[in-house]
Amino acid sequence: MRCLFLFFTCCFLFHSSAQTLTLVELNCENLFDCEDDSLKQDEDWLPTAVRSWTPKRYWRKQNHIAQEILSCQEETVPDLIALVEVENDVCLRDLTKRSLLRNAGYQYLMTESPDVRGIDVALLYQPLKFRPICYDTYHIQPIEGMRPTRDILYVSGLIASDDTLHVYVVHAPSRYGGERATRPNRQLIANRLIEAIQQLPENAKVVIVGDFNDGADDPALQFLENHSLVNITRHTTGSHGAKGTYRYQGDWGSIDHVFVSSVLLDFVEQTYINDAPFLLEEDKKYGGVKPLRTYIGPRYQRGFSDHLPLVVRFRFGPI
């Protein structure tokens, strides 16, 4: 575990009767740069590949991700952003320093996982609202027949109310190969999370966020709930027709979730899906609307992501 030596200034240690903290989770749908990494299978994301992943498309994607984040709440930017499916530090540096987010002041921590495609998870944070104390990455040892997967990112930090928040960012193994056949792969993630949380102090304020590739009632997520974690986004919807963060063959569902320890329940003020109209398109085959994604197979759609942002607002202070 890496611990950060921080010098706290008066601009961070402000106090009032209550402090809000907004968390956003977003699967970016393949935020890759345009350069070939010889150590990863990223050949689909090059200018010469079938998807024609050019610098122009890359920068449009960066600004689209920034737009999604900025549209998650009015007046101020989100305080914490858990991102899934980002390739590397280059992508995050461009997102935070050169995209439409460049003036927002975000800093970030991310994993460097053995995933064969090279995708990782990251946590963006506003330094005046969340100050990291320690961070670590938890490697998942594959079982027989399982490809190397994404590490879990762990970050503990101080928020403005002087509470310590323990944040875990997850991108669980996919269902490729069949849900039942791959179920043990996702159970590994749940097991590792519980092992980690059991090492924390009693009544620790824990947030687990990410793409679990499972629904709320699937075994791995039920395992988390059986260990005193609460899925606070189980029934979360949007205000423009989204009944989940993801739509497959006309059916809305949520494989993106936020779990918290029970001690945090009283501090949850609101949960919602950001389904702003510009993030949606008509579903001509099944009716209704669906996320306006970047690609459908190799066909470029000029969109945002195949997932919608999941938003949680906490209020810390006197209850």
Region spans (language model):
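Bacterial Sec-dependent N-terminal signal peptides
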Residues: 1-20
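N-terminal, active-site-proximal structural segment of metallo-dependent hydrolase catalytic domains
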Residues: 18-99, 103, 109, 113-119, ...
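Structured beta-strand-rich core segments of catalytic domains in phosphoester-bond hydrolases
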Residues: 28, 80, 86-166, 170-172
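Sec/Tat-exported extracytoplasmic proteins
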Residues: 32, 69-76, 82-85, 90, ...
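Second-shell loop/turn segments in exported
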Residues: 49-56, 77-83, 110-111, 141-143, ...
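Active-site environment of divalent metal-dependent phosphoester hydrolases
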Residues: 88-90, 116-118, 175-177, 213-219, ...
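Extracytoplasmic, non-cytosolic globular domains
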Residues: 153, 157-237
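Metal-dependent phosphoester-hydrolase catalytic domains
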Residues: 195-206, 214-319
